[in-house]
Regions:
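Cytosolic juxtamembrane regulatory segments of multi-pass membrane proteins
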Residues: 39-58
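Transmembrane alpha-helices and their extracellular/periplasmic helix-loop junctions
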Residues: 1-40
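Alpha-helical scaffold within the catalytic cores of cyclic-nucleotide enzymes
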Residues: 92-109, 125-166, 170, 191-204, ...
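A structural signal for short, well-ordered beta-strand segments
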Residues: 67, 119, 164-170, 240
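Short, conserved phosphate/pyrophosphate- and ester-handling motifs at nucleotide-, phospho-/glycolipid
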Residues: 42, 71, 233
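Cytochrome P450 core scaffold surrounding the K-helix E-X-X-R motif
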Residues: 177-180
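Cytosolic regulatory/linker segments at or just downstream of nucleotide-handling modules
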Residues: 173, 196, 202-245
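Catalytic NTP-binding/metal-coordinating core of nucleotidyl cyclase/transferase enzymes
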Residues: 56-138, 186
Length: 245
């Protein structure tokens, strides 16, 4: 009989090495996912991504998504009051952002970025989200309600009220890791994103705190027609609506 002990040992050795390398690769992938998405999506989504990293397509893909922009309106009185106390001003902004962000994440949204006191969020990436338009709408309405509660707290603390404008739009865009070889972020590009930002900035013009495009409308809400707006590069105007309080 041939002595196969050496062969078995060698096979076991290489199997151990392969298993260890696979473990390290998976560990690094999970750590990278937590680092990249841990503060931008809900903990449940992070766990799902860590469990199955193949769900991610970080290289870039085209898909229908829903976008939400929210920004503080009339920030000047607050900034003027605390111009000599920048730490207090930052604290107020952070309390506002936390108040609003928790609601977005609760409804499956991803925080793309903060731009000062502005929040940009989207639905349907990095994971597919069912009823993305409805979840964005529910989030916006809950954000409105939560801000009212936060303003009551601010009032008791002598802090001026915060008012916001919010824009929601849905459409095709490109999503994935974007940036230079030294720094990149998971973000989006497309006309649908730009329109959502434009709707948010138009809230003051239409004296409302929420504008939703016709592409994001869902059943079950009492929409009030506002206007038709022409989007750069498009021949057909887009109908825009609000949902009254």
């Amino acid at each position: 009989l041939l002595d196969v002990t050496g062969t078995i040992f060698i096979a076991f050795f290489f199997w151990t090495i392969a298993t260890f390398r696979s473990f390290i690769t998976q560990f690094m992938m999970r750590r990278q996912i937590k680092k990249q998405f841990g503060t931008y999506v809900s903990p449940d989504l992070v766990k799902k991504l860590q469990k199955d990293p193949s769900l991610l397509r970080l290289g870039g893909e085209t898909k229908r998504m829903t976008f939400l922009f929210s920004d503080i309106r009339g920030f000047t009185p607050i900034s003027e009051k605390y111009q000599n106390d920048p730490q207090k001003l930052v604290e107020i902004v952070n309390r506002f952002l936390t108040n609003q962000t928790e609601i977005i994440m609760k409804h499956g949204g991803t925080i793309d970025k903060y731009m000062g006191d502005c929040i940009m969020a989207f639905w349907n990436a990095p994971l597919d989200i069912e009823e993305q338009e409805r979840k964005a709408t529910v989030a916006a309405l809950e954000m409105r309600e939560a801000l009212g509660e936060l303003n009551e707290i601010f009032k008791n603390e002598g802090i001026p009220e915060i008012h916001t404008g919010c824009g929601i739009n849905s459409g095709l865009c490109v999503v994935g890791n974007m940036g230079s070889s030294n720094r990149f972020d998971y973000s989006v590009l497309g006309d649908a994103v730009n329109l959502a930002a434009r709707l948010e900035s138009s809230c003051k013009t239409y004296s409302t705190d929420l504008i939703i495009s016709e592409y994001s409308m869902v059943d079950g809400y009492d929409y009030q027609f506002l206007d038709e707006v022409t989007v750069k590069g498009k021949s057909e105007p887009v109908k825009i609506y609000t949902i009254t309080k």
